[in-house]
């Protein structure tokens, strides 16, 4: 535990974005765009927050929506996340009172390597700038995330073909947003008119390359968040991953040193990540699986391996 540099921060971003399949495809891709736009806008207006921390906050800004929606009304949650690419409609359907913003803040706060102010900004990422009663740097960061959210939502509504009309719609969505600070709005419009940056900001690549490495303790908190998102996808696996992690910890406590035991617990939290590729129709099927369904189910083990990270020593 005294060895602080074991797991690359890049691994968390890669694992999080690997969830962008099936029901989580749109929300994770949206989160990735918000992460990149938030970082770019925060840099543009000269905010003091570290760019990597801004990126992570943007990446996690809607995790509270997944948690709230899945717990409160699972059937509506699955139907909406699977069939409605317009995430703004999902928010209006499942969270009219914007409670998910505070939940996202709480989730980010429990990840030890995310800056407290960046996590706090998530509380206000749907709040008009003039209504935020907090530190100005927090308010401006929240407004950058709000602008990034607005841009991404407009893009995803028209994402089949990126055309002149799509770009106009994105610019207009920013111009019409009365909740944006003038400086943030100007930076957002300028960004949309700069084709050099726009391609990278809208693609499906992470564009995240950090030199930071995390201890087992730090990464375990992030692995718990990933495990929560995995388990929330199906009521049949709601406590499965955490149960496996707890039992793994108990079994390894007497057999391994502390660091190796923690690595095993992290592996337990991530052991079913490949199951994201398995359709719910197969996961929830009553009775025996047919031959094809069995093959599909078994492929998730290979997907697990592709999604895991390399440990640096």
In which residue ranges do the predicted regions lie?
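Histidine- and acidic-residue-rich, metal-dependent catalytic cores
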Residues: 2-313
């Amino acid at each position: 535990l005294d060895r602080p540099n074991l797991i690359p921060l890049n691994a968390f971003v890669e694992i999080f974005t690997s969830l962008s399949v099936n029901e989580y495809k749109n929300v994770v891709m949206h989160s990735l765009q918000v992460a990149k736009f938030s970082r770019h806008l925060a840099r543009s207006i000269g905010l003091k927050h570290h760019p990597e921390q801004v990126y992570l906050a943007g990446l996690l800004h809607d995790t509270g929506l997944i948690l709230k929606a899945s717990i409160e009304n699972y059937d509506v949650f699955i139907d909406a996340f699977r069939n409605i690419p317009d995430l703004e409609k999902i928010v209006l359907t499942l969270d009219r009172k914007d409670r998910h913003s505070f939940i996202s803040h709480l989730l980010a706060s429990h990840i030890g390597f995310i800056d407290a102010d960046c996590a706090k900004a998530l509380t206000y990422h749907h709040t008009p700038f003039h209504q935020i009663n907090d530190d100005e740097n927090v308010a401006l960061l929240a407004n950058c995330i709000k602008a990034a959210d607005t841009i991404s939502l407009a893009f995803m509504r028209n994402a089949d073909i990126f055309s002149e009309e799509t770009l106009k719609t994105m610019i207009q969505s920013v111009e019409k947003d009365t909740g944006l600070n003038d400086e943030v709005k100007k930076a957002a419009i300028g960004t949309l008119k700069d084709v050099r940056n726009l391609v990278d900001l809208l693609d499906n690549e992470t564009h995240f390359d950090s030199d930071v490495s995390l201890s087992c303790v730090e990464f375990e908190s992030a692995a718990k968040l990933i495990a929560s998102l995995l388990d929330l996808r199906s009521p049949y696996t709601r406590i499965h991953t955490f149960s496996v992690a707890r039992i793994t910890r108990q079994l390894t406590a007497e057999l391994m040193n502390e660091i190796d035991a923690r690595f095993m617990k992290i592996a337990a939290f991530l052991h079913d990540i490949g199951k994201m590729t398995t359709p719910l129709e197969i996961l929830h099927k009553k009775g025996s699986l047919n031959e094809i369904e069995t093959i599909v189910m078994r492929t998730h083990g290979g997907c697990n391996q592709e999604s895991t990270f390399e440990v640096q020593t």
